[in-house]
């Protein structure tokens, strides 16, 4: 077929080169043909579509956009089932969620999108990323092995060796849950073997470890951190000119930290601990 529009039910196909079998409802399309279904648009160098089974496949330079739920999938292979609303992408796969004020970008070996219906009038989407995951927003960036983002509660969960960056702060744990609001990150929960690291210079790092950590954000910056259970703190107090005074090592059960302009403003330990302050030239390497 030449330049053609094929319309059936809720579907629309535009193609300038391809074949469409009207008897079995199957199409094989080339030259950046486009399949549209209820606000979703699938295009690639080549397409296969089965109207009876309700699915389409796209190959090479694939873009799938969902204008209703405001997300996008790209890659060199994409599958979409219009009956279950399930989408799958691989080979240089990237997902973009632009349903909130700040877009969330996710890259992984494999990306999947699921649609769940709470009732006849309500639904939410879930994006799952597997292996070599990287995610980016203007306020936070992260890497991990697996990731799940749910539009139901705007929660992004990172699994297996997750690392999260916010400005000069680095957060690590066995699992990290990040809760978004419309325009920025709201708070994060770092579970099991939680660690926060802030680099001050080439050899000095503020470090906090604990069983778990809860971090609250405002305006895209970390403002308050609660560290709970088996807390160990390595902290470098500063002079007014930012000269490091020494290295303080403390241990406690609960630590509340308050930050302003990306710097420590106040710290509360329960029970209180004065710790040990080492001069800069006498820092024991095993405690750094």
Report each predicted region and the residues it spans.
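Structural signature for solvent-exposed beta-strand/loop edge elements and short helix-capping sites
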Residues: 1-288
């Amino acid at each position: 077929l030449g330049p053609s529009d094929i319309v059936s039910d809720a579907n629309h196909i535009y193609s300038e080169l391809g074949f469409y079998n009207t008897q079995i409802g199957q199409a094989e399309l080339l030259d950046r043909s486009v399949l549209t279904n209820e606000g979703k648009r699938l295009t690639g160098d080549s397409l296969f579509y089965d109207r009876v089974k309700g699915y389409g496949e796209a190959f090479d330079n694939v873009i799938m956009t969902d204008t209703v739920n405001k997300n996008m999938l790209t890659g060199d292979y994409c599958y979409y089932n219009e009956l279950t609303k399930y989408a799958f992408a691989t080979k240089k796969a990237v997902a973009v969620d632009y349903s909130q004020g700040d877009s969330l970008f996710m890259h992984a070996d494999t990306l999947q999108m699921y649609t769940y219906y709470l009732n006849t009038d309500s639904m939410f989407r879930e994006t799952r990323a597997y292996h070599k995951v990287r995610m980016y927003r203007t306020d936070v960036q992260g890497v991990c092995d697996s990731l799940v983002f749910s539009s139901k509660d705007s929660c992004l969960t990172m699994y297996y060796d997750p690392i999260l960056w916010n400005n000069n702060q680095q957060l690590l744990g066995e699992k990290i849950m990040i809760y978004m609001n419309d325009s920025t990150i709201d708070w994060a929960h770092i579970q099991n073997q939680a660690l926060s690291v802030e680099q001050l210079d080439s050899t000095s790092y503020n470090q906090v470890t604990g069983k778990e950590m809860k971090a609250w954000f405002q305006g895209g910056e970390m403002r308050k951190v609660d560290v709970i259970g088996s807390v160990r703190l390595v902290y470098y107090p500063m002079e007014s000119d930012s000269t490091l005074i020494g290295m303080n090592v403390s241990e406690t059960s609960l630590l509340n930290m308050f930050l302003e302009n990306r710097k420590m403003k106040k710290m509360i330990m329960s029970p209180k601990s004065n710790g040990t302050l080492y001069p800069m030239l006498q820092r024991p390497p095993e405690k750094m």
